[in-house]
């Protein structure tokens, strides 16, 4: 697996075949039992795994595409990441540039944003909406999750003319999130 990632990263460099990757949005290194994905230009240390959390989606897609065969990890990730509806959604909402560095969401960010979106769009009989909390560890991509969430909501709910307000509890977090939004040009 590591060799496949290294080769894919190497092949994007000037002395190899960068033209092959010119229009690619998502790249994947895989063998039967392991998969890692990234965007073009992503250094090896930032390649990551995808863990499908929508088991109904995965089960239906695997049944459709494999019909009776035992799926491998490669099969599961190919279906999870490259099902037509999913890959288009990932490209549209979940790839961004952070200070001119192309980034794609991690699976945790994707599924958190999808759940938040459902909650934001759902109201009770009096028009009230639920609130919620997403817990992230330090360095897990909270700022980028907020940027991707804002992008998703602003694009998905465009007819409603949504506004996004980010509230922080510390000046340092305020500076950090402001910088992240500015670097992604979503400010």
Give, region by region, the residue ranges found by the protein language model:
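ATP-dependent helicase/translocase motor core
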Residues: 1-168, 172-187
């Amino acid at each position: 697996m590591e060799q496949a990632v290294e080769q894919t990263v190497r092949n994007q460099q000037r002395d190899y075949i960068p033209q092959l990757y010119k229009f690619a949005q998502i790249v994947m290194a895989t063998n039967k039992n392991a998969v890692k994905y990234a965007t073009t230009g992503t250094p090896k240390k930032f390649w990551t795994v995808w863990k499908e959390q929508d088991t109904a989606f995965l089960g239906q897609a695997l049944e459709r595409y494999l019909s009776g065969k035992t799926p491998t990890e490669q099969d599961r990730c190919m279906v999870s990441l490259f099902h037509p509806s999913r890959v288009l959604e990932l490209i549209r909402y979940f790839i961004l540039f952070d200070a001119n560095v192309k980034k794609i969401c991690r699976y945790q960010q994707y599924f958190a944003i999808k759940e938040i979106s459902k909650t934001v769009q759902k109201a009770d009989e009096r028009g009230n909406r639920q609130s919620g909390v997403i817990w992230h560890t330090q360095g897990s991509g909270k700022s980028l999750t907020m940027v991707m969430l804002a992008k998703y909501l602003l694009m998905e709910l465009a007819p409603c003319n949504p506004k996004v307000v980010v509230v922080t509890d510390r000046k340092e977090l305020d500076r950090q999130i402001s910088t992240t939004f500015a670097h992604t040009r979503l400010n």
